[in-house]
Amino acid sequence: MAYFNYNRRKSSVAQIGDTPMGGENPIRIQSMANVSTMDTEAAVAQAIRMIEAGAEYVRFTAQGEREARNLGEIRKQLNEQGYTTPLVADIHFNPRAADAAAGEVEKVRINPGNYVDKVKTFSHLEYTDEEYAAEIEKIRERFVPFLNICKAHGTAIRIGVNHGSLSDRIMSRYGDTPEGMVASCMEFLRICREENFPDVVISIKASNTVVMVRTVRLLVRTMEAENMHYPLHLGVTEAGDGEDGRIKSAVGIGTLLCDGIGDTIRVSLSEDPEAEMPVARKLVDYIRERENHRPIEASMAPGFDTVATSRRISRVVEGIGGTFSPVVISDRSSGDFEFDYLSLPDYIYIGKEDPDNLPDNFRLLVDAHFWKERPNAFPCFIASEAEELKDYDCPLKFIRLTYMDLTDRMLEILKADKTVVVLLSTHHRNGVGSQRAAMHKLLMAGCDVPVVLHRDFRETDVELLQLKSAADFGTLLLDGFGDGLMLHNEGCEAVVSDRCMFGILQATRTRISKTEYISCPSCGRTLYDLQTTIARIKEATSHLKGLKIGIMGCIVNGPGEMADADYGYVGAGRGQISLYKGKECVLKNIPEEDAVERLVQLIKENGDWVN
């Protein structure tokens, strides 16, 4: 992986219709329809909207052979209107539907968790090695005929592993782990290689960004060990909608793109599918800006493992560092003192002097030469002022540094002064690589100074600010780096930056400040109005800080993706909902119009409600 210097991973090419993926091809953008696959007119119309919004592949669900066959009619009508963008069939539980779809569309996605193995029941199964090998042979017996159909029609496949739909067989041997997800994928990849089938794309997805990133990195490492280089499809499942969905997607997808990993992406939003393409395009374009950047000379700290990261050990300075949650520092040097009480920062930076309208009860960062001793104000230095740190008698001092400032003398100062916190900035085009280099230099020097990650942007587009800051900060946080965040942006109100920082910390699971919603983007299997339902559930429960609520269109990934959710709302049929407490379905087939109220009642009955 390209850890310090950005380079795309060298993948093999999968031929998908007339739009190949991998190799030197651009990172492709795709999405999935949410209308019924049997509603041909609606499906064609939505596909056209997605294509015109930038989709390079369009996916439809195919629950059975009937839906799979109808994809041929959708393909035909799109061709007649001049749209040749490859179509993809999404298959769960039904290998016969995969066989049928292989003759109708350019690519078929199968899920190893439910292609041959029995439906997930969360049961623990015991296998001898011989019995386990026999189960894999069953996969081969069913999978090879499907590959032969694909060969005959020039159809590509995606082996799409979801965290939420690992089989009981895999779960029993590996547990709910990255190793289990990778093992599930590799069973199918080895058969593809043995059968000389090259047009394969892989995805390993999860709603938990930590799990998703670690697992994809482990998959790449495992494939390299077996000399496999298949292209990768990236996505965060059940990312949600609005700001949360964009930030969570950018954290997971952006981190891997920063590593040089990924040949196609889907930003899974609980919104209309055509809304996903502009978001995905902005994210890809931002990462590509660092191509051919000035090289960063750096070394990785011995023992650091990108697959098994943990938070860097830092000393504690006035509640910053150690095991304390990362702090949020808001740059208010512009004089903007409007705040959102749901995202109040821990500190504010005011720059050179105290403005007249300075709010009370905030801890302040003040430029060192303008600092006056008082209980809630702390001096902020720049690199050239480092020798002056010892002249200031206060319990907390900040110093703004870049990677290039970390000289031997600077490291001596940082080690000696136990009251200092670093604001780690970057001016490099590959800011992530530069800040990674700085963190590894601190590790190798044995310097445990707390580090607040700092970035500057000039964005008037709020969505672009969310994507850029989430990709950059998220990458470092998932590496285990960062005792806080400081985001300065010229172009939007400061409160927008504050919300971004709290959203990024939530998405990386480093600091929980609000309710977390694990909501799917919906597809043709969803039989209720997902977007309206999400809005109603959020309105009723958004004050329940730290609670995780899953909102799923159907049972395909629902119970599994909600495995670490406290409560779940899952479509059970047309107009019917099932409610979950953890993994257990506690209320079945509730009328949709009553389901949100019953969810609130369930939360209250279990003692998790606050007024």
From Swiss-Prot:
Chain positions recorded as [4Fe-4S] cluster binding sites: 520, 523, 554, 561
GO biological process entries: isopentenyl diphosphate biosynthetic process, methylerythritol 4-phosphate pathway; terpenoid biosynthetic process
EC number of the protein: 1.17.7.3
Details of cofactor binding: Binds 1 [4Fe-4S] cluster.
Swiss-Prot/TrEMBL cofactor(s): [4Fe-4S] cluster
Annotated InterPro entries: Dihydropteroate_synth-like_sf, IspG_atypical, IspG_bac-typ, NO2/SO3_Rdtase_4Fe4S_sf
Substrates-to-products reaction catalysed: (2E)-4-hydroxy-3-methylbut-2-enyl diphosphate + oxidized [flavodoxin] + H2O + 2 H(+) = 2-C-methyl-D-erythritol 2,4-cyclic diphosphate + reduced [flavodoxin]
Gene3D superfamilies with a match to the protein in the record: Dihydropteroate synthase-like (3.20.20.20), Sulfite Reductase Hemoprotein, domain 1 (3.30.413.10)
Pfam family, one: GcpE
Pathway: Isoprenoid biosynthesis; isopentenyl diphosphate biosynthesis via DXP pathway; isopentenyl diphosphate from 1-deoxy-D-xylulose 5-phosphate: step 5/6
Keywords: 4Fe-4S, Iron, Iron-sulfur, Isoprene biosynthesis, Metal-binding, Oxidoreductase
Gene Ontology molecular-function annotations: 4 iron, 4 sulfur cluster binding; 4-hydroxy-3-methylbut-2-en-1-yl diphosphate synthase activity (ferredoxin); 4-hydroxy-3-methylbut-2-enyl-diphosphate synthase activity (flavodoxin); iron ion binding
Function: Converts 2C-methyl-D-erythritol 2,4-cyclodiphosphate (ME-2,4cPP) into 1-hydroxy-2-methyl-2-(E)-butenyl 4-diphosphate.
Family: Belongs to the IspG family.
Protein's UniProt name: 4-hydroxy-3-methylbut-2-en-1-yl diphosphate synthase (flavodoxin)
